[in-house]
Amino acid sequence: MALLVMVRHGQSIWNLENRFTGWTDVPLTEKGRAEARACGELIYCVPFAVAFTSKLTRAQDTLRLILEAADQPDVPVIEDQALNERHYGELQGLNKAETAAKYGEETVRQWRRSLEGRPPGGESLKDTALRSLRYFYEKIVPELEAGKNVLVSAHGNTIRAILMELDHLSPEQVEKVEIEYCVPVAFEHQADGTFSQVLMPRCDIIRPPQPPARSIARL
C-alpha cells in the first residue's frame, strides 16, 4: 500500500488579482509561499520517494517549499507539461469579474466549471483530463504500484481532473469540486489497483507511533 498526496500550488500573484492564469508563468505571493511551508509542516512525517510537478513556476516553487518544510529536500522531482494548469486561451490574463460582465456569468461559469465548456482558444476540463490522466497512469501509478509514496504539486483543474477519475465523479459533481491552495488531498493505492481517499495527516498508516521517551532517574 502506498500513499498519493496531491497539492494545489499556493496563492499566485494572478490568483490575488482574480485573473485567469492558465499556462502563464506567474510567481507565488508571500501568502502563497507561507501556505506551501505550512503544508510541508503538516505532512512532514510522510516519507516521499518521488515527487511530480508541472512546468509552471508556481507549482514548482510550492513543491520545493513543501519538501524543505517537511525536511525532505532531496526527494527526486519530475517535471512535466502534462500536469500544467488548464489552458484558458484568450482568457489568460483577464480579470474574472470583468470577463463575466463581458461574456455573461453563465457562459463564463460553463467555461470554468463544466466538463466540456471550452473558452476561446483554450482547453475544456475534459481536454485537461485527457492529458493529465494519461500521464498519471503512465508515470505516477507505476511508482505507487512499486510501493512508493508520491507527492504531486499541481493545479486546481489538473487535480480536479484526477479526482474526477479516482472518486468516480459525474460531470455534475465535478462542477462543484473546489481545490484549495496547499490543502493536501490523499489517496491510498491498494494492492488491487484501486484508490481510496483518506484524511490528512494520516501519519499512523505510514510510520508507527514512536514510543514515549523514557525518563532516566538520577542516581
Swiss-Prot record:
Disulfide bonds: none annotated. The keyword Isomerase applies. InterPro entries: His_Pase_superF_clade-1 (IPR013078), His_PPase_superfam (IPR029033), PG/BPGM_mutase_AS (IPR001345), Phosphogly_mut1 (IPR005952). The active site is at 9 (tele-phosphohistidine intermediate), 85 (proton donor/acceptor). GO terms for biological process: gluconeogenesis; glycolytic process. SUPFAM superfamilies: Phosphoglycerate mutase-like. The record marks 155 as: Transition state stabilizer. Pathway: Carbohydrate degradation; glycolysis; pyruvate from D-glyceraldehyde 3-phosphate: step 3/5. GO terms for molecular function: phosphoglycerate mutase activity. Keywords: Gluconeogenesis, Glycolysis, Isomerase. It catalyses: (2R)-2-phosphoglycerate = (2R)-3-phosphoglycerate. Substrate binds at residues 8-15, 21-22, 58, 85-88, 96, 112-113, 156-157. The keyword Iron-sulfur does not apply. Signal peptide: none annotated. PANTHER family: PHOSPHOGLYCERATE MUTASE. Belongs to the phosphoglycerate mutase family. BPG-dependent PGAM subfamily. Catalyzes the interconversion of 2-phosphoglycerate and 3-phosphoglycerate. This is 2,3-bisphosphoglycerate-dependent phosphoglycerate mutase 2. It comes from Gloeobacter violaceus (strain ATCC 29082 / PCC 7421). The gene is gpmA2.
